């Protein structure tokens, strides 16, 4: 975020994340005391892809810290698509499971679109289901992918009022760029999305009050 008042500011993401976990823990403790219930998160992990193992381990750790019941269902990388779909249907009907997350990427024999569409939209933790994507695009309440939502929370720590700001987003992925644009539009920003085919990217970036980079590669 560019401002005549703010020249350089390092945001401590770990500190902000801890504050958010503390707030969530208080909410869950309150829910438990009133209703004797806590949210339940089930993660489906397929194969032994190292980064996915790390992501899931961190999800388990954070869920435990805030008081969420966490379960990980692990499958070998050659599991059939039908078996995973059957498990998702079972989780959709399980009242103890309030959130379902299928860790990506998936092996080639499994259709990602089918898997995402099979998840109950109200239990879609990633916000990838077409209903959640459509609701976000329409400005309605929706489950939002965690990376753009976290980015917005950090931006608003610096500048709570984003109305009228010019935001430039580098990257148009369904995971980051597109939902980030929708979130900033909801904050009444003027949003420009740039990508690998954008001409004169430097000029576009220089116009920005807010610059969000989500391309996954350096330089």
What function would you assign to each model-found segment?
Residues 1-6:
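Intrinsic disorder/low-complexity segments
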Residues 39-41, 167:
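Conserved hydrophobic helix-helix packing surfaces used for dimerization/oligomerization
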């Amino acid at each position: 975020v560019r401002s005549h008042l703010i020249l350089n500011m390092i945001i401590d993401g770990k500190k902000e994340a801890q504050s958010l976990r503390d707030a969530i823990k208080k909410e869950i403790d309150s829910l438990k005391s009133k209703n004797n219930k806590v949210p339940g998160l089930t993660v489906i992990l397929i194969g032994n892809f190292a980064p996915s193992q790390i992501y899931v381990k961190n999800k388990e750790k954070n869920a435990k810290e805030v008081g969420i019941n966490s379960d990980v269902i692990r499958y070998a990388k050659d599991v059939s698509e039908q078996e995973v779909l059957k498990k998702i249907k079972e989780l959709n009907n399980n009242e103890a499971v309030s959130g379902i997350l299928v860790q990506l990427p998936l092996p080639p024999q499994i259709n990602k679109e089918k898997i995402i569409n099979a998840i109950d939209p109200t239990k879609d933790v990633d916000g990838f289901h077409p209903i959640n994507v459509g609701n976000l695009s329409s400005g309605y309440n929706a489950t939002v992918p965690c990376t753009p939502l976290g980015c917005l929370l950090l931006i608003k720590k610096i500048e709570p009022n984003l109305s009228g700001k010019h935001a430039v987003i580098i990257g148009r992925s369904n995971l980051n760029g597109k939902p980030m644009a929708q979130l900033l539009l909801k904050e009444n920003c003027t949003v420009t999305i740039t990508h690998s085919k954008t001409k004169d990217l430097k000029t576009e970036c220089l116009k920005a009050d807010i610059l969000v980079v989500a391309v996954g590669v350096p330089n």
